[in-house]
Curated annotation (Swiss-Prot):
Its main location: secreted. Beta-glucosidases are one of a number of cellulolytic enzymes involved in the degradation of cellulosic biomass. Catalyzes the last step releasing glucose from the inhibitory cellobiose. The active site is at 225. SMART domains: Fn3_like, PA14. GO terms for molecular function: beta-glucosidase activity. PANTHER family: BETA-GLUCOSIDASE (PTHR42715), BETA-GLUCOSIDASE-RELATED (PTHR42715:SF27). This is Probable beta-glucosidase I.
Length: 838
């Protein structure tokens, strides 16, 4: 790669070459023009790890804690470190552009991708995202803020029209993008799938050009989400530089024709190409060649950072009677469906094949010096557990054979064209390629041998994007080839899991075969769903057991144990791109199991893993409760570090946890109805709503305890004299003394809130405007400074003037942290002023 003379290159490009540059060539690469030294660039998903170019059978990667977990750290320095490692992982994968971070707002607990965004609050989300991007781009890799904007649900995400006031748009949904860009000018922005007030974002000139480019002065590259381009002329004229993925649907000959008919002028195409070439120059110093090989890093120092991030994200929700930390020397009983499952990431774009994972059971076992016992408690899988890791090939290897054909099984003498050895029996084939496969229609036989450890009836399940028949010893057990039903897996492309059963004997070996046909063989109606490649498969199995039997056994064991930890929650099956959750509840049986174990042993510790809030009807019984999110590679070790006190928890909730789904402000207005969703809560998202209507959530935004105690004192403000205009921001510096009044070293997160004066406009009771994290030894006191700009601390969006309004009056400043102590002071705004810009 070489630095390009952008203007000279534009002059030398033909119209056909310009048009080609404005769209990808495949799922992960941009177009090249070799004669002018313009190479193809590689892009890769990056919500919580850099997957590389393959969903299917790809090169493993580091998996970071999910964004809500990172949001819970409230730690800008940590986010900077995470961003740097993300950049280094990207370079190892030969990737120039990371498709992240996600900074949408969780207006509902049910959003399928809620775990991908940092927080329900734009200030927390935007500041963390800015530092994350700064660390990432320091490596030379380009960051992509997404999804711009209001991509806050999965239901009908390609078509839904988000009806939202401009005030809510500015104060809630655009704010994290605005604040992130003040900290780090990211190289890229990705548009959202949805419409806003009638127009798809990827062709919305007001959003892309008027606000992003002109008002904010940003000059990077705007790309579509994958298959999120819906027009030729409208999108190119609105400012969409790059259509992804390729091959193009809307550019190519269609764009050339639009230019020839003056639907789009060539100088507009030049503007799009200019941004693409500027991106080439941004990433050129990396020296990553076209189609670079992908490799793994997995360095010890990276593992240490991942473990620290996992531990620092764990929120101590309750710790009555100082149940925690646990005693290492005592025996411990570990209960629950998440104990031996590594719930390390959510589903969809965030999913990847991690270098390794650590389950909570493994994490606890590694640190306990006493006996560690286990009880299942309940099964909480949405679909049957993967069978692949329990199979063996005919030559004794773990896993199964994956044999590919162009013809169906009914064709005699068909030719084998590819054979792979796999362990995971879940595969999304959107990037599988073979030179002998010319279309998306092909067939796969997956064959392995299963030897059960116990007698019983075994349930088998098959989920496909395509068709599938599962045989056990040549007997058809599951037929998922006819009368298929739409499911939620694999971005919403897959069928419902179809099941069948067979009685098996312990120690006897059975041949298991899945006959799979790719997506074109399916009869599902896929309208409104993003179609990703040739299809996918998933097959699982489990011995049929009684949940009541499991719960009773767990409760009985708990009644006799001195230390008990329950691990429950969700997994990537329940929280995933392509599907919103139907409710906030834990999987069936989980609440009953937790409640009965707590009845049997009131000192049992409950650990919940989920990316977004869940209901906790047993919370009043629990003395000790942790929220542990999806913690990445090191999730099990991170949780164990907090349980045993190696790490003193400091995390605070980045989301409000309502008592029940009906309490959340978007309850009446979530999901698409007749193609639209009304953002009826307006600016009252999350804590803004609960505080305005005086409705207590189960656990509020910003809540989190510690193994030590803190006090705050000596709050003071230093303000900047007012000027006629507010464009320079007029910084306000809050200084507060923080003391560790306990006996354990720990970190405190100081939160600065501003409450507006009474005006003629309805405003939230208070809003977060700044925060800082400080580490203190026992008895140590430090002064903490938080600087906020007056214009950001005081302003609301005036729809009549189409400007931010900083109104005259007295503004109260509140400083909070761990515990109930609130420090207060105030400052004056002497004159109402209006402003625009970043």
């Amino acid at each position: 790669m070489v630095q390009l003379d952008v203007e000279k290159t534009i002059e030398e490009l033909t119209l056909g070459e310009k048009v080609a540059l404005t769209a990808g060539i495949d799922f992960w690469h941009t177009a090249a023009v070799p004669r002018l030294n313009i190479p193809s660039l590689r892009l890769s998903d990056g919500p919580n790890g850099v997957r590389g170019t393959r969903f299917f059978n790809g090169v493993p990667a580091a998996c970071f804690p999910c964004a809500t977990a990172l949001g819970a750290t409230w730690d800008t320095k940590l986010l900077h470190e995470v961003g740097r490692l993300m950049g280094e992982e990207s370079i190892a994968k030969g990737t120039h552009v990371v498709l992240g971070p996600t900074i949408n707002i969780q207006r509902s607990p049910l959003g399928g991708r809620g775990f991908e965004s940092f927080a329900e609050d734009g200030v927390l989300s935007g500041i963390l995202a800015g530092h994350y991007c700064k660390g990432l781009q320091e490596t030379g890799v380009a960051a992509t803020l997404k999804h711009f904007v209001c991509n806050d649900q999965e239901h009908e995400r390609l078509a839904v029209d988000s009806i939202v006031t401009m005030r809510a748009m500015r104060e809630i949904y655009l704010l994290p993008f605005q604040l992130a860009m003040r900290i780090c000018k990211t190289a890229c922005v990705m548009t959202a799938y949805n419409k806003i007030n009638g127009t798809h974002v990827s062709e919305n000139k007001q959003i892309i050009t008027d606000i992003l480019r002109k008002e904010w002065g940003w000059d990077g590259l705007v790309m579509s989400d994958w298959f999120g381009t819906y027009s030729t002329s409208d999108a190119i004229n609105a400012g969409l530089d790059l259509e992804m993925p390729g091959p193009t649907r809307w550019r190519g000959t269609a764009l050339a024709h639009a230019v020839s008919s003056n639907k789009a002028f060539e100088f507009v195409v030049d503007e799009r190409v200019r941004n693409i070439l500027n991106l080439h120059n941004f990433v050129e110093p990396l020296g990553i060649p076209e189609n670079a090989p992908e490799k793994a890093l997995n360095r010890p120092e990276d593992q240490a950072l991942l473990r620290r991030a996992a531990a620092e994200s764990v929120v101590l929700m309750k710790n009555q009677d100082n149940i925690l930390p646990l005693k290492k020397e005592k025996p411990i009983l570990v209960i629950g469906p998440n104990a031996k499952t590594a719930a390390y990431c959510g589903g969809g774009s965030a999913s990847l094949d991690a270098y390794y994972t650590v389950t909570p059971f493994e994490g606890v076992s590694a640190q306990s010096q006493g006996e560690v016992k286990f009880s299942q408690g309940v099964y909480s899988y949405k679909e049957l557990p993967l069978l692949g890791p329990l199979l063996k090939t005919d030559d004794g290897k773990k896993g199964f054979k994956f044999r590919v054909y162009n013809e169906p099984p009914s064709e005699p003498n068909r030719q084998l064209i590819d054979e792979l050895h796999l362990e995971s029996s879940s595969g999304f084939l959107m990037d599988y390629k073979h030179p002998k496969i010319k279309t998306f229609t092909f067939y796969v036989d997956m064959e392995g041998y299963f030897t059960p450890e116990e007698d019983g009836i075994y349930d088998f399940g098959v989920t496909v994007v395509g068709t599938g028949k599962l045989f056990v010893d040549d007997e058809l057990v599951v037929d998922n080839s006819k009368n298929q039903r739409q499911g939620t897996a694999m971005f919403g492309n897959a069928t419902v899991e179809e099941k069948g059963s067979k009685e098996l004997k312990a120690g006897q070996t059975y041949k298991v075969v899945l006959q799979f046909g790719t997506a074109p063989t399916s009869d599902l109606d896929m309208r409104g769903v993003v179609i990703f490649g040739p299809g996918g498969f998933r097959f699982g199995a489990a011995r049929r057991v009684s949940q009541e039997e499991l719960i009773s056994k767990a409760a009985e064991l708990a009644s006799q144990a001195s230390q008990v930890v329950i691990f429950a929650g969700l997994t990537s099956e329940w929280e995933t791109e392509g599907h919103d959750r139907d409710h906030m509840d834990l999987p069936p049986g989980s609440d009953e199991m937790i409640s009965r174990v707590l009845d049997a042993n009131p000192n049992a510790v409950v650990v919940i893993q989920s990316g977004t809030p869940v209901t906790m009807p047993w919370a009043h019984k629990a003395k000790a409760l942790l929220q542990a999110w999806f913690g990445g590679n090191e999730c099990g070790n991170g949780i164990a570090d907090v349980l045993y006190g190696a790490v003193n928890p400091a995390a605070k909730l980045p989301l409000s946890f309502p008592v029940r789904l009906q309490d959340n402000p978007s309850y009446l207005n979530f999901r698409s109805e007749r193609g639209r969703v009304l953002y009826g809560e307006d600016v009252y998202v999350g804590y803004r709503y609960y505080e305005k209507v005086d409705l207590a959530p189960l656990f509020p935004f910003g809540h989190g305890l510690s193994y030590t105690t803190f006090s705050r004192s000596d709050l003071s403000l230093a303000t900047t004299p007012e000027k006629p205009q507010l464009e320079d921001g007029e910084p306000i510096t809050a200084t507060v003394s923080v003391t560790n009044t306990g006996s354990v070293a720990g970190a405190e997160i100081v939160q600065l809130w501003v409450a507006p004066p009474p005006t003629g406009v309805n405003r939230p009771v208070r809003e977060l405007k700044g925060f800082a994290k400080v580490f203190l030894q026992p008895g140590e006191t430090k002064k903490v400074e938080i600087v906020v700009e007056k214009k950001l601390a005081t302003s609301w969006w005036d729809e009549q003037r189409e400007k931010w309004a900083s109104e005259k009056g007295t503004y109260e400043v509140l400083v909070t942290g761990t515990g109930d102590e609130v420090l207060k002071t105030s400052f004056e705004v002497g004159k109402t002023r209006y402003w625009l810009g970043l």
